[in-house]
């Protein structure tokens, strides 16, 4: 192996070093001095690096006790305080939550605390139609003037100001409960009507009700007469209410419908919330005797008038039982084909017709029959006929009885050769005993 010989006159040539070698301090050996180990060199290097890092961190972070940059914390806190100081005290609440898909059609409204509402705008999202409403006199609330539609998307913007004039705004977009997921009960009689003593409260629901107890318990019917009123279910979609005996003449009946949010069955919820009142008029109960072909009208318990009639023929007798007038028509068409008598009659202008059953029993004027049949023989297909004129003019028994009758008056048929009318065929639940009626209640 080649050896390099050095001397003062012949210095050693410079040796090339690797980058790693350049980083290492030259090792010198001092005679008599302890030899440094590789571990010591590494320790010194790490210590030096740590010190440099500490200096760098100190330079970046600064002295915590010195003034200067605070990472923006004090500035942000000041901005937050200013924003809080400028925020309105008016807090707006919208009853229908933003994004809701099953909002009530009745309870939509706006309330504010710490201020007053200045304006509220509710629109149907698809059509842009504005829903009219009104802010309360004290400015604390707003309600729409009409019931909202089912299954409709709405947008609401409400603005208010506090006592210092600072504004607040609240927005909400929501969709009302769909018709597929809700139920409605069509009811009779209507609010404000005056009806006869036999008029029940009758609900017909547009969906099958399986949760009958909850639905019935959220409909309260009461009378100023103090009579006990009980509900009775006919199947799963009809619920009627009546007292044990006919309503007291002159009394006021009130029904409170609180079905909004009530579960009627799987996947269906009620949406109605309202109070309805109607008045019971004078008492009028008319009794038709098929043996004599006469009808006796009693007004407030006293005989008022007797009228000759022509009831059902022997082939088509009239139902027996208590029947309630449910509809009145100055003139109507009666077509036999609609009730199983196809081709036997089709009279387009029957005068003074009043419905007694949903299957087609009426008490009505008759201008086509001979005057001799009234009070003597039954000639109809099951209706009760009264002498009348074509067009309904003149002074006739048919016209008189029509004018003297109310929806809800009772017509009792007796001594007919037919069966008693079914209690759910029309508004004829009076044909059930009180015990049987109460047995049909779900409450």
Protein language model features and the residues they cover:
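Acidic, low-complexity Ser/Thr/Gly/Pro-rich repeat segments typical of extracellular/periplasmic
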Residues: 2-31, 36-282, 309
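Short peripheral tails and domain-boundary helices/loops at the edges of structured domains
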Residues: 188, 284-292, 431-443
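Pocket-edge structural micro-motifs
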Residues: 96, 114, 223, 243, ...
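A short, structured loop/turn motif at beta-sheet edges
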Residues: 163-164, 248-249, 319, 357-358, ...
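Exported/periplasmic cell-wall-interacting domains
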Residues: 336-443
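Gly/Pro-biased beta-strand-loop elements
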Residues: 267-374
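Soluble periplasmic/extracytoplasmic beta-strand elements of cell-envelope proteins
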Residues: 93, 109-111, 121, 155, ...
